[in-house]
C-alpha cells in the first residue's frame, strides 16, 4: 500500500530546478486555484531557508481537503537561500519578515490573514490529506478555542522505522501525561489553529 506522502518525497529536499516542469506547474496551478479572496480558513506557513522543502510542503497543502474557501500565506523569515525564488516560481502569496524567529514570522502572517480560522504551520513538513479539515472540524465547535497537532518523522533510506516509533511513542506518552493537568502546554507553538472571533 502506498503511503500518502510517497509522491511528495520525490521532491522533498530537492532543488526545484531538478523537478520536472510538469510537476512544478501542476502545483502552481493548484496553489493559485485554491487561493480565495474571501477565505474562511487562513493557513499561515513560516519559512526560513526552506528552498528544498517548500515544493513538497505546498504540494501537500494543495492536495488537502477543505470544505470552505481558504488561503495559504507564506512568510519568508530572513532566508539566505532561494526560498523567495521558489515561492515566486510557485505563484505563492508570501510576505517578508526581517525580524528572525517563529514568533515574528507567525505574527507577520497573521497580520495579513483574512480567515475566521487561522492554522499556523511550518514549511519543513508535508501535511496529510485531511490536515486542514481536521483542524477546522474541531475549531467550528463553540467550546473549542484552539487546536494543535503532533507530527511524525518519515525515515530516510537506511533508517529504522522502529527507532522513530519508539521516540514518537515516548513523546506522545509525555504529552498525554502533561495534558492531564496542563493541556495548554502541549501546544508547543509548532503547529496550531485558532478562531479569531
Place the predicted regions along the sequence by residue.
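N-proximal low-complexity "stem/linker" segments adjacent to membrane-targeting elements
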Residues: 1-60
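Short, acidic, metal-binding catalytic loop of nucleotide-sugar glycosyltransferases
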Residues: 59-69
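Glycine-rich, basic loop-to-helix element that forms the pyrophosphate-binding segment
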Residues: 97-113
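A conserved acidic beta->alpha catalytic loop
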Residues: 60, 76-84
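Short aromatic/hydrophobic "clamp" motif used to bind/position activated sugar donors
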Residues: 118
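Conserved donor NDP-sugar-binding/catalytic core segment of glycosyltransferases
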Residues: 130-161
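Short, flexible, basic/aromatic active-site loop/helix in glycosyltransferases
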Residues: 149-155, 164-185, 189
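Acidic helix N-cap motif at the loop->helix transition within catalytic regions
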Residues: 52-55, 81-88, 130
